[in-house]
């Protein structure tokens, strides 16, 4: 049986591949695929509607090789940044102080 961390890693990989390749390269997320992933998989972070301007900025920030898509490595950086943000939030919460 796999550990919770191993399960979490498997979910992160499976989630990427669930959305990648619907619009072209099966190993990259297009802007539309990234938008759908954010809306369906991270609704607490984006709210009910994904902000187009925010999505454009996010894609630009993540897209290190400027191919207008997010590859797995760029996606992993995105997840790491979200994880750091969550950790910072919980470290600052009154229950942890």
Curated annotation (Swiss-Prot):
Entry-linked SMART domains: S_100
GO molecular function, one term: calcium ion binding
Domain of life: Eukaryota
Keyword Transmembrane helix recorded: no
Residues at which Ca(2+) 2 binds: 63, 65, 67, 69, 74
SUPFAM superfamilies xrefs: EF-hand
GO biological process, one term: endothelial cell migration
Domain EF-hand: 12-47, 50-85
Alphabetical UniProt keywords: Calcium, Metal-binding, Repeat
Coiled coil ranges: none
Binding site for Ca(2+) 1: 28, 33
Cited Pfam families: S_100
Cysteine pairs bridged by disulfides in the record: none
Subunit structure: Homodimer. Interacts with FKBP4. Interacts with PPP5C (via TPR repeats); the interaction is calcium-dependent and modulates PPP5C activity. Interacts with TPPP; this interaction inhibits TPPP dimerization.
Function as written in the Swiss-Prot or TrEMBL entry: May function as calcium sensor and modulator, contributing to cellular calcium signaling. May function by interacting with other proteins, such as TPR-containing proteins, and indirectly play a role in many physiological processes. May also play a role in suppressing tumor cell growth.
Additional information: This protein binds two calcium ions.
Full protein name: Protein S100-A2
Source organism (scientific name): Bos taurus
């Amino acid at each position: 049986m796999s550990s919770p961390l191993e399960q979490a890693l498997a979910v992160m990989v499976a989630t990427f591949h669930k959305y990648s390749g619907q619009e072209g390269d099966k190993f990259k997320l297009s802007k539309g695929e990234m938008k759908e992933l954010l809306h369906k998989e991270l609704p607490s972070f984006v709210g009910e509607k994904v902000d187009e301007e925010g999505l454009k900025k996010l894609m630009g920030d993540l897209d290190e090789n400027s191919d207008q898509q997010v590859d797995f490595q760029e996606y992993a950086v995105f997840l790491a940044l979200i994880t750091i943000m969550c950790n910072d939030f919980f470290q600052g919460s009154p229950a942890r102080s």
